C-alpha cells in the first residue's frame, strides 16, 4: 500500500516525481518492501507527459473518453484540449497516430478495469496497475468538470506555456521510458473488457497481502506503516482532485500549493516507523501538517462555497472555475458527481480533525499503534481497519453543519451505489470508500447494529436500558472509537429526519422505539395507573425464570389501591383486558365474588376466556375463581375458548381442571367447537385430556361429523385414529385379561370416555339393535377400563383399584361378573333406546380416565 499511495501521488504531481521516488525508496528500506519505485514513478508520469508535450497546438487531443465499433472500424471518443464536452467527436484510430500516448493511456485504463475481476484470486499486485487505476478514476471524475469557459482556457494555456523547460524534459524522458515497458502488459490484458469492480477491492487485497507477507516481528513496523499509508492516501486524494481540474490550468494550481504538500508528505515518509524517532520531527511535522491542512481546506471550501453562502478563494480565477465546476456537476447528476462531493467532504473532515487535534504527535502515534495492535488480534481474517474508519466517530463530532444541504442532494445517488455495487464488500473496504462526510446513513447503520444483539446481551432489560447507548463487545472489536460514535449517533438521531431517506429514518426510529417501550411507562385510559414492565406482551427473552413464574402466579407486582374498585369496574376491566386494574382490585382488601354471573350467566373467567386474556385468566384462577361455571345454555369457559380458537387459553383452562365433556343445551362440546373451527392443535389437546369423541349432539352428530363438515382432513384423521386406538387397546386388554378364552363378536355401543375428575356419575343413551341370529353360548358384557393417556399412547387395565360402585341399565342394577372386582358387569340391553348410569367414586383430583364399552362375547 506504500507503493499504491506513492504511485498515486506521483501521478497527480509529475513535477516532483524524481524527489518522491527517492523518498519512497527510503521508506521502503525501513519496512522491507523494495523495488519498482523508479519504474512506478516513470509510469505515473507518463499519463501527463503525452498530453502536455504539444502545448502550443490548439487542436491537441486532451484524452480519449470512450470507444465503440461501427462498421468494422474502431472509433474513439476524443476530448479536444481547450474545448468542452459538447465538442467531443468520434475519430477513427488512424486519426490518432500522432497521439499514441493518449491512446495508450486509454487502453491501459480499459485493461485495468478489465483486469480487476481476473485478479481477484491473485495475491501479488503489480504497482503500475494501481497507478493507472488512480489515473482512470480521476479521468472519469474529471469528465464532469470540463465546463469552464473558453476564455479561461486560453488564460490557463498562456500560463501553461510559461512552464519551465526542465520539468517538460523530465516528463518526456519518463514518458519515453514507460512506452517500451508497458506495451507487452497492455496487449496481454486487452482481451476481455469488464467494467465491474472499483479500486477498493485491490486496495483491500493489497492490505491482506502486506499482512501475510510480513514477519511477525515486524508487527509494530506494519502498524505505524498503516498510519503513514492513511496520511499519504489523504494527500493522494487531494492530488487526484487536482487532476480532475481541466488540464490547461493544472500547472497554475499545482504551483500554488503542491510544493507545500510535497514537503509535508516527505516529512511523513521520512518519519521513522519506530516510536522513539517520532519525537525528532515533531515540530516540523506539525508545521507541515497545518500547511497541508490549510491548502486542502481552501480547495474544499471553494467547492462547497456556492451552497453555503461563503467564498474563500485562493485567487479570483480559481474561485470562478470552482463555481463553474459545481454548476456543471449539478446539471449532470451522475454517480461521479456524488463521488466528487464525497471526496471533498472526506478531505475537509480529515483536515478539520488534524487541525483541531492538540495531542502531541508521539502520543497520537502510540495510541494508534495500540489500537492497530488490538484490531490485529481481534480481527485475524480481515485487514486492519484504516485510520479514517477508526476515527470516524470523532470526525462526525467535528462535522460542520453547513454541509447538510449538499448532503441532501447527494444522498440518493450515494445510497444507490452503495447498495447495488458494494453489497458484498468487507466492512473495512466500506469504511475506506464510503463517504466520511455522509454521516447519516452510517449512523442509521450503527443504529441498526444496536438491535442485532444476541439473546445473552438482551437477557436483562434494565441493564440493556442503562447501557443502551453503548455498543456491544462484538462491535468494539471492529472499531476502537465506535462506542463514542454510537453514543453520538443516538443523541443526534432525532435530527436525522431532514438528512436521510424516509424509509431509513422510520426503520431506525421504529426499532429504537420498540426497545424503548419495553420498560417505558404509559398511562392507561383512566390516566391513573401505569402499565407494568411485565405487561400483557411478555418479553420472554429478557424475563428470568423466577420472574416468569411469579408472573404466572400473579405475584410479580403488588399495588396498593388508593380507592376501592367497584365490582362493575372490575368486570369492565376483565372484559377490556385491563390487567393493572384487575390486579390492583384483586390485591386489595376488597372482597369480590369472582363467580358472580351477569344477566347472561357469564362469569369473570368466561369473560377472560372469551377474550383470550390469558394473563387475566391466570390471575383469576390464582385468586380462586372457578373454571367450570356454566351459563344458562350450558356454555363453559372452555367452550368459549375453543369456539374463539384460543389455543393457549384452552391449555390454561385444561391445566386448571376444566371439564372437557360438558355439553351445551344443544349437546355440543368443546371438542365439537374445535372441530368446527378446524383447529387441530386444540382438538389434539382436548383428546389427550380425555375428551369423549363419541358424544352425540342434540341432532345426533358426533365430533367426526363436524370435522368432516369443516372439510379439515387433519382433524378428521386425528379423531379417527384416536377412536381406532381406543378400540384396539380395549380389545387387546380384554384378550389379555381372559387369556384368549373369550372371543369378541361385536360392540354394542361405541366406546365412551369419562374423566373421573369430572364427577362421580356417568350416563349415556344408546340404541341397541339385536342381531337376527344370536350365536349360541354368547352374551353381552360391560367393560369399564381404567386408562391413562400418555400423548397418543393409551394404557388400559381391568384390574387393580377400581372406582366403580354401581351400574344401572334402564333403572335395573347390573351385577359384576367377579365379586372382588367391579371392572366387568353383566349387561342386558333391550332392543331400541337404552339408558345407562354408572355410579363412581368421588375423586376430583384423579387423572384416570374410564373407557366404557359393551361387547357381545362368546366363550371358547
Curated annotation (Swiss-Prot):
The keyword Cell membrane does not apply. The modification Phosphothreonine is found at residues 144, 334, 385, 454. Phosphorylated in M (mitotic) phase. Phosphorylation by CDK1 promotes dissociation from chromatin. Residues 129-191, 206-440, 458-496 are annotated as: Disordered. GO terms for molecular function: chromatin binding; histone H3K9me2/3 reader activity; methylated histone binding. InterPro entries: Ankyrin_rpt, Ankyrin_rpt-contain_sf, Chromo-like_dom_sf, Chromo/chromo_shadow_dom, Chromo_domain, Chromodomain_CS, Dendritic_Spine_Reg/Scaffold. Changing residue 334 to A: In STA mutant; fails to dissociate from chromatin during early mitosis. Residues 59-118 form the Chromo domain. Pfam families: Ank, Ank_2, Chromo. Residues 259-268 have a biased composition (Low complexity). GO terms for cellular component: cytoplasm; cytosol; heterochromatin; nucleolus; nucleoplasm; nucleosome; nucleus; plasma membrane. The modification Phosphoserine is found at residues 51, 85, 136, 138, 149, 164, 188-189, 192, 266, 272, 279, 319, 392, 400, 403. The record marks 59 as: Interaction with histone H3K9me3. The modification N-acetylmethionine is found at residue 1. Keywords: Acetylation, ANK repeat, Chromosome, Nucleus, Phosphoprotein, Repeat, Repressor, Transcription, Transcription regulation. Its main location: nucleus. One of its GO terms (biological process) is negative regulation of gene expression via chromosomal CpG island methylation. Heterochromatin component that specifically recognizes and binds methylated 'Lys-9' of histone H3 (H3K9me) and promotes recruitment of proteins that mediate epigenetic repression. Mediates recruitment of the HUSH complex to H3K9me3 sites: the HUSH complex is recruited to genomic loci rich in H3K9me3 and is required to maintain transcriptional silencing by promoting recruitment of SETDB1, a histone methyltransferase that mediates further deposition of H3K9me3, as well as MORC2. Homodimer. Interacts (via chromo domain) with histone H3K9me3. Has the highest affinity for H3K9me3, and lesser affinity for H3K9me2 and H3K9me1. Component of the HUSH complex; at least composed of TASOR, PPHLN1 and MPHOSPH8. Interacts with DNMT3, EHMT1 and SETDB1. Interacts with MORC2; the interaction associateS MORC2 with the HUSH complex which recruits MORC2 to heterochromatic loci. Interacts with ZNF638; leading to recruitment of the HUSH complex to unintegrated retroviral DNA. Interacts with TASOR. Interacts with humanin. The chromo domain mediates interaction with methylated 'Lys-9' of histone H3 (H3K9me), with the highest affinity for the trimethylated form (H3K9me3). This is M-phase phosphoprotein 8. The gene is MPHOSPH8.
Amino acid at each position: 500500500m506504500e507503493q499504491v499511495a506513492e504511485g498515486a501521488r506521483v501521478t497527480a504531481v509529475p513535477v516532483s516525481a524524481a524527489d518522491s521516488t527517492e523518498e519512497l525508496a527510503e521508506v521502503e528500506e525501513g519496512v522491507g518492501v523494495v523495488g519498482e519505485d523508479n519504474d512506478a514513478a516513470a509510469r505515473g508520469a507518463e499519463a501527463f507527459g503525452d498530453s502536455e508535450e504539444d502545448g502550443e497546438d490548439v487542436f491537441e487531443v486532451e484524452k480519449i473518453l470512450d470507444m465503440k465499433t461501427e462498421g468494422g472500424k474502431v472509433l474513439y471518443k476524443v476530448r479536444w484540449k481547450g474545448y468542452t464536452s459538447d465538442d467531443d467527436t468520434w475519430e477513427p484510430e488512424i486519426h490518432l497516430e500522432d497521439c499514441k500516448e493518449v491512446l495508450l493511456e486509454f487502453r491501459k485504463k480499459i485493461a485495468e478495469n478489465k483486469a480487476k475481476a481476473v485478479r481477484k484470486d491473485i495475491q501479488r499486485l503489480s504497482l503500475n496497475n494501481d497507478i493507472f487505476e488512480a489515473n482512470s478514476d480521476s479521468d472519469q471524475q474529471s469528465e464532469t468538470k470540463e465546463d469552464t469557459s473558453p476564455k479561461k482556457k486560453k488564460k490557463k494555456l498562456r500560463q501553461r506555456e510559461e512552464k519551465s523547460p526542465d520539468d517538460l524534459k523530465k516528463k518526456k524522458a519518463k514518458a519515453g521510458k514507460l512506452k517500451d515497458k508497458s506495451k507487452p502488459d497492455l496487449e496481454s490484458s486487452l482481451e476481455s473488457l469488464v467494467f465491474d469492480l472499483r479500486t477498493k477491492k485491490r486496495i483491500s487485497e493489497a492490505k491482506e497481502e502486506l499482512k501475510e507477507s510480513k514477519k511477525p516481528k515486524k508487527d509494530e513496523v506494519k502498524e505505524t506503516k498503516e498510519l503513514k499509508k492513511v496520511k499519504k492516501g489523504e494527500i493522494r486524494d487531494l492530488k487526484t482532485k487536482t487532476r480532475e481540474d481541466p488540464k490547461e490550468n493544472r500547472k497554475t494550481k499545482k504551483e500554488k500549493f503542491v510544493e507545500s504538500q510535497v514537503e509535508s508528505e516527505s516529512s511523513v515518509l521520512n518519519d521513522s516507523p519506530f516510536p522513539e524517532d517520532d519525537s525528532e520531527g515533531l515540530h516540523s511535522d506539525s508545521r507541515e501538517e497545518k500547511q497541508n491542512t490549510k491548502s486542502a481546506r481552501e480547495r474544499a471550501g471553494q467547492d462547497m462555497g456556492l451552497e453555503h453562502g461563503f467564498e474563500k478563494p485562493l485567487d479570483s480565477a480559481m474561485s470562478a472555475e470552482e463555481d463553474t465546476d459545481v454548476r456543471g456537476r449539478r446539471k449532470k447528476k451522475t454517480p461521479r458527481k456524488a463521488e466528487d462531493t464525497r471526496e471533498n467532504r472526506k478531505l475537509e473532515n480529515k483536515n478539520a480533525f488534524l487541525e483541531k487535534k492538540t495531542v502531541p504527535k508521539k502520543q497520537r502515534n502510540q495510541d494508534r499503534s495500540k489500537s492497530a495492535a488490538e484490531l490485529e488480534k481481534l480481527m485475524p481474517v480481515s485487514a486492519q481497519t484504516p485510520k479514517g474508519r477508526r476515527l470516524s466517530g470523532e470526525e462526525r463530532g467535528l462535522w460542520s453543519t453547513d454541509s447538510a444541504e449538499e448532503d441532501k442532494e447527494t444522498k440518493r445517488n450515494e445510497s444507490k451505489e452503495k447498495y447495488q455495487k458494494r453489497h458484498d464488500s468487507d466492512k473495512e473496504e466500506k469504511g475506506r470508500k464510503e463517504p466520511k462526510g455522509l454521516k447519516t446513513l452510517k449512523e442509521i447503520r450503527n443504529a441498526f447494529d444496536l438491535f442485532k444483539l444476541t439473546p445473552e446481551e438482551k437477557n436483562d432489560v434494565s441493564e440493556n436500558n442503562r447501557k443502551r447507548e453503548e455498543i456491544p463487545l462484538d462491535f468494539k472489536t471492529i472499531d476502537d472509537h465506535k462506542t463514542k460514535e454510537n453514543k453520538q449517533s443516538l443523541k443526534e438521531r432525532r435530527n436525522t429526519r431532514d438528512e436521510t431517506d424516509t424509509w431509513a429514518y422510520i426503520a431506525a426510529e421504529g426499532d429504537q422505539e420498540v426497545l424503548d417501550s419495553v420498560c417505558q411507562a404509559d398511562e392507561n385510559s383512566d390516566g391513573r395507573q401505569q402499565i407494568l414492565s411485565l405487561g400483557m406482551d411478555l418479553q420472554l427473552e429478557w424475563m428470568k425464570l423466577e420472574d416468569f413464574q411469579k408472573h404466572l402466579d400473579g405475584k410479580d407486582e403488588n399495588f396498593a389501591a388508593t380507592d376501592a374498585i367497584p365490582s362493575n369496574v372490575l368486570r369492565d376491566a376483565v372484559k377490556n383486558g385491563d390487567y393493572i386494574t384487575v390486579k390492583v382490585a384483586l390485591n386489595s382488601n376488597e372482597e369480590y365474588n369472582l363467580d358472580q354471573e351477569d344477566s347472561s350467566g357469564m362469569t369473570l373467567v368466561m369473560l377472560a376466556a372469551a377474550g383470550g386474556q390469558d394473563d387475566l385468566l391466570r390471575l383469576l384462577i390464582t385468586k380462586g375463581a372457578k373454571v367450570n361455571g356454566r351459563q344458562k345454555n350450558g356454555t363453559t369457559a372452555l367452550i368459549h375458548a375453543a369456539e374463539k380458537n384460543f389455543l393457549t387459553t384452552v391449555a390454561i383452562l385444561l391445566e386448571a381442571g376444566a371439564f372437557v365433556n360438558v355439553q351445551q343445551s344443544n349437546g355440543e362440546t368443546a371438542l365439537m367447537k374445535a372441530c368446527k373451527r378446524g383447529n387441530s392443535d386444540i382438538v389434539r389437546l382436548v383428546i389427550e385430556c380425555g375428551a369423549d369423541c363419541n358424544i352425540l349432539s342434540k341432532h345426533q352428530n358426533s365430533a367426526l361429523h363436524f370435522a368432516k363438515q369443516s372439510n379439515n382432513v387433519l382433524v378428521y384423521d386425528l379423531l379417527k385414529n384416536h377412536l381406532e386406538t381406543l378400540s384396539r387397546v380395549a380389545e387387546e386388554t380384554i384378550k389379555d385379561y381372559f387369556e384368549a378364552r373369550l372371543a369378541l363378536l361385536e360392540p354394542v355401543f361405541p366406546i365412551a370416555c369419562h374423566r373421573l375428575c369430572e364427577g362421580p356419575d356417568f350416563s349415556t343413551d344408546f340404541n341397541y339393535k339385536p342381531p337376527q341370529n344370536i350365536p349360541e353360548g354368547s352374551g353381552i358384557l360391560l367393560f369399564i377400563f381404567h386408562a391413562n393417556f400418555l400423548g397418543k399412547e393409551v394404557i388400559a387395565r381391568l384390574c387393580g383399584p377400581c372406582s366403580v360402585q354401581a351400574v344401572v341399565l334402564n333403572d335395573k342394577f347390573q351385577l359384576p361378573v367377579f365379586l372382588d372386582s367391579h371392572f366387568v358387569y353383566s349387561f342386558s340391553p333391550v332392543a331400541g333406546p337404552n339408558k345407562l348410569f354408572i355410579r363412581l367414586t368421588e375423586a376430583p383430583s384423579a387423572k384416570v380416565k374410564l373407557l366404557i364399552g359393551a361387547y357381545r362375547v362368546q366363550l371358547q
